[in-house]
Structures are given as structure tokens and as C-alpha cells.
Amino acid sequence: KNSLLKYSEQYTTQKKIQRPSDDPTVAVRSLKLRTTYSQLTQYAEKNVKDAMSWMNTTETALSNISKKFDNMKSYLNQGANDYLKADDRKSVLTTLQQYVNSIFEDEANTDYSGRYVFTGYRTDTSLLFPENTDKLSYQIKENFSYDSFDNITVITGGANYDSTIANGQQYTDKTAKKNEVYQLRLAYDNCSKDAFAQAGTNGTSIAISFTYKDQTTGKDTTEVYAAAGYNGTPAAKGNIITRSSTDTNAYEVGDNEIVYLYDTGEVLVGKTKYADIQTKQADFSVTYVKNDFEKNDIRPEMYFKCTAYDSVNNKTTDYADPSDQEIEYEINYSQNIIVNTQAKDAISTDIYRMVDYISKTVKYVDEVETKIDEVDKMISNTTDKDKLATLNSLKTSLETERDLRSKVMTDAFGMGLTMIDEAGQKVSVATSELGAKYNRAQLTYNKLLDEQTDSEDKLSENEDVSLT
């Protein structure tokens, strides 16, 4: 009778046992197999899929950035190889700015299921400021190497119409001249000329710390150059001159001088100081202050070690160097995979800073061409020989300035091409590393599916009644 009942229950349920006491061995094995199957399902259907989706979202953004770089190259080529008329310059520049905005706003700020994919551990914080803010002040530490400088040509001087000038030679004497300087662009413009006001900081608007190996002693040596007010350690070896780019002597740099243009975020060094940096192959950090941020500016803590001060809440926050903020997923037993790529490792801030520089060179060409047009109108409206001679001298001087500034502008477009190649290489490396991790996750996923099937077969063999 018991056997008949047992077989009847097995036939109805198609299971070998109905309760653990029917066969403890089968019951224990079933528990282990079900636990294994549940874990495999968690890995395959949740962990690995989430990891692959995160990486796929990142890869899509990086791929879109690469495509936008390719599109930008054609416009940069136009500016580098052709003399563009004013309307064409405006069109090219506007297009470049739109691409840069799209790269950061649409791609670098992307998220997966509400988590920002390029912001390291701070997945709940956007890469960019969502709105203008004047309540935050940052002291930012940005690292560079000795080869980070650009050799650029700057135009100084230049003639302007002056109704009191009657001698054309006076305009000739004011003709613009070109100078070469070594330029370092910081990640931000519109920086502060004032010190970071919080206690424990270095008491100045900018300080540069050079580190190199002393050729005599073989020891690592640090030299600091700073603007007025510096009270850090070690003591400053030299001074940094602070100016605005609108100062008449903004780009006049002595051979051994360092000049900081706070409004454009530029550091300029003279040729002797530059040669010294190159000889020593000095790595260096620049610590500077920025007070106000516009909507879609990059949050400094996503790229740099920095200190933030919230003036509304009177709160100071120290942010460590954001390197190596790795987010890991467990995708199999004792097998983890890093799913995230940080913006600082893939998307260079040089992109928008270079377009800022191009914009400035275009602006200067536009301004001098406007001056020439105004002089042409004055020439056409007078028959006075002396005045014509004076105006023609002014025009000649302005045309010289236009030619000089046009060369600087085309060089800037050419530098943009080089920058895009370098930034594109950075994206390419990040994409390749991401692709390798994605392929590993895909192999793990396929293996998990096989193990799931095998686990199902073993579970069925252990639990199910064979009706054949």
C-alpha cells in the first residue's frame, strides 16, 4: 500500500521525493544543486547583464565622441588650410563649439539607470554643473609634465585710429609685432586673481611646484614659484606675475619670467625658464583658484585633487585625487570585473580649452578686419591728400596686423588638429580597454549559461522521476 501511494505521488508530482525524509541523500543533493543554480542565475541574469549594459552604455558614448572628433577634423582642416572669410569663420567656430558642447553634455555626462558612468565612485553626481553657481570656490591642483607647453605666437601692439594723429609715421611706429611665448592652458578660464580664503591653504591665487632630479646630488628636488601672498612649504624660489589678458603688456614675458593670465587660465613662461624646465625634465603641479562656475562646466573633483568651499553653508570639502576609482561587479565565483571608465582617463579637457583658444584668435582677426573696413570708409569719404596719406599709413599698419593675426589663427586651427588626434588616441585606448573587459564578460556569460544548463540537468536527474 505504501509503495502504491509513493508511486502515485511520484506520478502526480513527477518528483522522486515529496519530503526530505523520503530520501535525505536526494534532499541534501537537491538543496546544494538549487543553491548553485540560484547563484548561477544571479550571476548570469543580473550581475553580468548589468555589467555588460554599463560597459555598453560607456562604449556607445566613447564611440560617439570618436565620431564627433572625426567630424571636427574637417572643420579644423578648413581653418588650418584656407583663409576663411568672416562669415565662414563664424560658421566653422560655431560648429566646433557645438561639437564640444555635445561631447561633454550628451556623451561625457551620460548615465546608466540613473548612475553617471564617467564619474568614478560618485555615480549619483553629474560630471557637469547642472546650473550656474557662484556659491562654490575651488582651489585646484592640476598636474603637468615638462612637455605640456605649447610654443605659440602672440601679437602685441597695433595701431588704432586717432583723430589727433596727422603724421602717418606715428601709425607705422605702432605696427603690431609678433612674439613667441611658451603657453600652458589650465583646465579652466575665468579663474581668480585672489587667494583661496580658507585656512590651511597656500595664501595665494597660484603656485607652481616643479619636481626634478638634481643632476649633482641625484636627489628629488622641489622648487616653488608663486604669486604674492604665498605662505606654503617649501618657500617660494621665485615670483609669478599676475595679469589680465586685456592688459597692454599681458603677453610680454621676460626670458626668466612666469606670467599668469587669470582670466584666460594661461601660464606663460619665458624662453630661459622654459629651457630650464626642459633640461631638468621637471614634472610640476599648478595650484590655482576658481570661484564661479557656469552651467555645464566640469566639476573639478572629477578630474583633480581640490578643495571646495561652500560660502552659503560655510563648509569646506577636500577631494582626493580621483584616480583609480574602480567600480567592480562580481560576475562569477571569486571573479570580479571593473566596469567603469573615468572621464579623466578618456575625455581630455584640452578639447574645449583648445576651441576657446581658437575662438580668441578668430575674434582678434574679426576685430582688425572691422578696423580696416572703417578706415576704408574714411578713405572713401575724404579728398584731403595729407589725411589720405595718414589713413593709408594706418591701413598698411592694420593690414600687417591682420596678416600676423591670420597666421596665428591658422596655426591655432592646426594645433586643434594635433589636439584632436591626441584626444582621439586617449578615447581609443579607453575604448580598447573597455572592449577587452566586455569580451571577458561575454565569455563569462556564455560559460554561466552552459553551467546553468548543466545544473538544470543535474537537478532534474536528482529530483525528477523517469517515466520511461
Protein language model features and the residues they cover:
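Amphipathic alpha-helical coiled-coil/heptad-repeat segments
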Residues: 74-221, 268-270, 294-353
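Polar, low-complexity export/assembly segments characteristic of proteins
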Residues: 4, 8-11, 15, 120, ...
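Signature of Asx- and small-polar-rich beta-strand/turn repeats characteristic
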Residues: 215-286
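Intrinsic low-complexity, intrinsically disordered segments enriched in polar/basic residues
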Residues: 28, 49, 211, 221-222, ...
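The ATP-binding site of the protein kinase catalytic domain
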Residues: 2-10, 15, 198-201, 207-225, ...
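Amphipathic alpha-helical polymerization modules
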Residues: 1-130, 389, 396-468
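Surface-exposed intrinsically disordered loops and tails
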Residues: 163-165, 227-252, 310-317, 389-406
